[in-house]
């Protein structure tokens, strides 16, 4: 039995190696220039005309666009965001306008970080921003969004606004007192996941009516930093944090039909080659190519899941954060490892255009923002990266 297990593991490793990534300039993947500013923890979306918009995060209030249909593709700066610098916003095009939801930032240099519940929209034809007369039902940071149709977007996940804000208020109050600061940090992280009350309500925002609707709840725990993807009427929510420092490998899937979500059976992301367990990912890239759902990059804390299972609630204490370079694909209903990125990256912007997925910016293994734009595509069952 032991020999069979060893042989089985060897075979799985060989299969994974056979699916190794191909770095190509064959024309199946598009080369785009770097963003003018390094970008991590920002946001972005693509309109129906093939124009990508990205901004915020480490770029401050800056926004840029690039037209994929032009022969000479260059980034152009658009009007700066009026709502102040912020990170972890999400954005989507509705009715031809770019909507930006929530995020986390400071009202002033002296103020602590806080979660936002506001909404802004950008009108490309006028190059203007406008604050929408609405607020989200809950504060939105660490949330995710998908476009359901031209007027409606689905938003779910995210941290608990009150718990998150209180942590940064306490950190600010402890300035200059290392002992008190360490106590605040320990008390914040040393709790079970259920005590963080991450959002599990699914909201539908209707841009035409400027209304919010409760579409039910996730079939499991609420998460923050999950990846999301939508193709036709199939929704997928991939991994994320259960609490700060602790990821989940669970993948939620649902069908959107007749203005209703029907949840399907959960699945799990498999371990990467050479590893026994999958910690789960936060800040990963995702998108579809030739019908294959791809997810790559992100970050986790190897060993945190086992610590939590063993009863250590401050599960990532003393563990170095690891940025990932693995790419997984959902092929014929099964998740599998399909290759590696050129470098470990997470917390960038992923945009789908046809069969290509553009990974814009991100955070490298040193925690620094990057300005690169990477293109993913599946071709003849192989992962191509430009």
Curated annotation (Swiss-Prot):
The keyword Repeat appears for this protein: yes
UniProt-annotated catalytic positions: 241 (proton acceptor)
Xref: Pfam families: NANM
Record-linked SUPFAM superfamilies: Kelch motif
Signal peptide stretch: 1-29
Entry annotated with the keyword Isomerase: yes
Coiled coil, from the record: none
InterPro entries the record matches: Kelch-typ_b-propeller, Kelch_domain_containing_8, NANM, NanM_proteobact
UniProt Kelch repeat ranges: 51-95, 97-149, 151-186, 187-232, 235-284, 306-355, 357-386
Catalytic activity from the UniProt record: N-acetyl-alpha-neuraminate = N-acetyl-beta-neuraminate
Subcellular location: Periplasm
EC number: 5.1.3.24
UniProt keywords, alphabetically: Carbohydrate metabolism, Isomerase, Kelch repeat, Periplasm, Repeat, Signal
GO MF terms, alphabetically ordered: racemase and epimerase activity, acting on carbohydrates and derivatives
GO cellular component: a single term: periplasmic space
Superkingdom assignment: Bacteria
Function: Converts alpha-N-acetylneuranimic acid (Neu5Ac) to the beta-anomer, accelerating the equilibrium between the alpha- and beta-anomers. Probably facilitates sialidase-negative bacteria to compete successfully for limited amounts of extracellular Neu5Ac, which is likely taken up in the beta-anomer. In addition, the rapid removal of sialic acid from solution might be advantageous to the bacterium to damp down host responses.
Family the UniProt entry places it in: Belongs to the NanM family.
HAMAP family: NanM
Subunit-structure text: Homodimer.
Name by which UniProt lists this protein: N-acetylneuraminate epimerase
Organism: Salmonella arizonae (strain ATCC BAA-731 / CDC346-86 / RSK2980)
Gene: nanM
């Amino acid at each position: 039995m032991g020999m069979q297990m060893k042989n089985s593991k060897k075979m799985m490793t060989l299969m994974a190696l056979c699916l190794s990534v191909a770095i190509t300039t064959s024309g199946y993947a598009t080369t785009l220039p770097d963003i003018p500013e390094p970008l991590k923890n920002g946001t972005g979306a693509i309109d129906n005309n093939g124009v990508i918009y990205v901004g915020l995060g480490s770029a401050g209030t800056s926004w840029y666009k690039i037209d994929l249909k032009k022969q000479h593709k260059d980034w152009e700066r658009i009007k700066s965001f009026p709502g102040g610098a912020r990170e972890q916003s999400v954005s989507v095009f509705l009715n031809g306008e770019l909507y930006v939801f929530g995020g986390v930032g400071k009202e002033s240099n002296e103020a602590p970080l806080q979660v936002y519940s506001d909404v802004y929209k950008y009108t490309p034809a006028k190059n203007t921003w406008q604050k929408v007369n609405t607020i989200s039902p809950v504060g939105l940071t660490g949330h995710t969004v998908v476009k359901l149709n031209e007027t409606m977007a689905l938003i779910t996940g995210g941290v608990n606004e009150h718990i998150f804000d209180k942590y940064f208020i306490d950190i600010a109050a402890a300035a200059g007192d290392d002992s008190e600061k360490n106590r605040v940090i320990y008390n914040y992280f040393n709790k079970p996941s259920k005590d963080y009350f991450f959002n599990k309500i699914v909201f539908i925002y209707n841009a035409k009516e400027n209304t919010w609707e409760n579409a039910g709840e996730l079939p499991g725990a609420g998460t923050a930093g999950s990846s999301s993807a939508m193709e036709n009427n199939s929704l997928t929510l991939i991994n994320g944090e259960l609490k700060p420092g602790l990821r989940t490998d669970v993948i939620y899937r649902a069908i959107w039909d007749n203005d209703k979500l029907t949840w399907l059976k959960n699945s799990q992301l498999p371990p990467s080659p050479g590893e026994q367990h999958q910690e789960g990912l936060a800040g990963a890239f995702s998108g579809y190519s030739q019908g294959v759902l791809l997810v790559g990059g992100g970050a986790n804390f190897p060993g945190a899941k086992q610590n939590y299972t063993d009863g250590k609630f401050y599960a990532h204490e003393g563990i170095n954060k690891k940025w990932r370079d693995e790419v997984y694909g959902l092929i014929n209903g099964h998740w599998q490892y399909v290759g590696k990125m050129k470098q470990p990256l997470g917390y960038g912007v992923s945009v789908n255009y046809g069969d290509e997925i553009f990974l814009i910016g991100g955070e490298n293994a040193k925690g620094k923002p990057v300005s690169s734009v990477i293109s993913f595509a599946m071709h003849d069952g192989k992962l191509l990266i430009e």
